[in-house]
Amino acid sequence: MTEPVAARVTLGYSTTADRVRNVAPPPEDPLLAVIVSVQNPSETDWRSTLPESLTARGDVTFFEQVAWGVAKSRNLVLDAAETEYLLFADDDVEFDWPGILEGLALLDADPGAGMLLAAARDEHGRLRKDYPASVVPLTLRNSGKAATYEMLVRVPDVRARGIRFDERFGAGAENYLGDEYIFCADLLKAGGRGLHGPVVVAMHPDDSSGSRWGTDADRRARAVIFDRVFGWKAPAVRLAFGLRRRAELGGVGGALRFTLGR
């Protein structure tokens, strides 16, 4: 009798009670498991709204958290995953299953790598940002624009190093940016290693919290990320970043306030 194939990768969705119906994983596959973490502080009845496309599947597990915070939600998924690999997800992401399999193959070939920071397209089929032309080591510099749905992690490695999302950052927190970059930075600073490459694993619409620039709140939120990652070196790093991105920060004055963390 042939042994059943064990799932190798979990898609870990973070969503809210009023949006959980939007979750749309790839078709069922023996290698795939799905976890959906539902933020539901109001304790509303979201289960009755689930479409058959979710309820009829045998590979989906739901968890509920009675609190806001996407980082909390992603940590719940990280704790619950039972597969070697985990790819984080939002409820408006469409995944490319062949691309995910390509990402698994890259990590299989490099067992010392704790994660792959992959690539994504927008709804028009365009790459969402500049990605390296080939697979390169993950660094503090090239992981600065990390998006959660690009992060394919080796679960035992990140758990062994105690890497989690900092719940003071990310959507639903006052510091609503930076949770992904901080995760990557913490992995690297803990002695871990990662890969970054042009393997397209997802499609995500162009508009997101990571694409907002120019407001005072945005500038301050970005400044705090540098404090968290670079500590006492943060002002110097912010200065270099601010000079490069002064237009997005609101001109020279905005870049100066950013450098000072204001």
Regions found by a protein language model. Name each.
Residues 64-81:
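Glycine-rich, basic loop-to-helix element that forms the pyrophosphate-binding segment
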